[in-house]
């Protein structure tokens, strides 16, 4: 299914004009993507310090059912996208080694890293579907452009 990410990008760019708070920006992006495309779960995990040292992905703004709160570096699809610094498309989450099952209803997933001005990952956009193979490489450029709004 071809999704019109260009229109969503334009809508979000106008909506977020002048807004500097990253949590607000993440919340609006998650809401617009979720409502526009009817994804099952749409949200962000932020790179955050762990109390015992190091960093992890910590749940940020999202739309959908309750979610995992903490994701370790290089674990699951989100942690792997963070570690590899690249978008990961997973047609069938059951086939992804080390998949973290926050819900048995998630069947496919795409995770897009968010980079700061020096190229470090600061967050990931995680989108889940109840359908197998709901995402493809066709989704990558549009979603990467949208997260550049952060």
Language-model features and meaning:
Residues 1-66, 144-150:
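Intrinsically disordered, low-complexity terminal regulatory regions
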Residues 41, 111, 124:
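Short hydrophobic/aromatic beta-strand element in the GNAT-like acyltransferase core
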Residues 47-50, 56-104:
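Regulatory sensory and allosteric helical modules in signal-transduction proteins
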Residues 74, 124, 140:
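ATP/adenylate-binding site constellation spanning eukaryotic-like Ser/Thr protein kinases
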Residues 108-116:
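A short, aliphatic-rich beta-strand micro-motif
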Residues 115-129:
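Sensory-domain boundary capping and coupling elements
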Residues 128-146:
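Regulatory loop-to-helix N-cap segments in sensory/regulatory domains
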């Amino acid at each position: 299914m071809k999704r019109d990410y260009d229109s969503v990008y334009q809508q979000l760019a106008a909506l977020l004009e002048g807004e500097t708070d990253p949590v607000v920006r993440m919340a609006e992006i998650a809401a617009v993507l979720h409502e526009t495309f009817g994804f099952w779960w749409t949200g962000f995990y932020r790179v955050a310090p762990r109390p015992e040292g190091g960093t992890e992905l910590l749940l940020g703004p999202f739309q959908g059912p309750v979610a995992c709160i903490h994701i370790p570096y290089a674990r699951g699809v989100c942690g792997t996208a963070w570690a590899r610094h690249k978008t990961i498309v997973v047609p069938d989450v059951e086939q992804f080694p080390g998949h973290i099952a926050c819900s048995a209803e998630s069947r496919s997933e795409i995770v897009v890293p968010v980079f700061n001005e020096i190229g470090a990952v600061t967050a990931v956009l995680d989108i889940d579907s109840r359908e197998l193979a709901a995402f493809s490489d066709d989704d990558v450029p549009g979603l990467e452009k949208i997260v550049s709004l952060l």
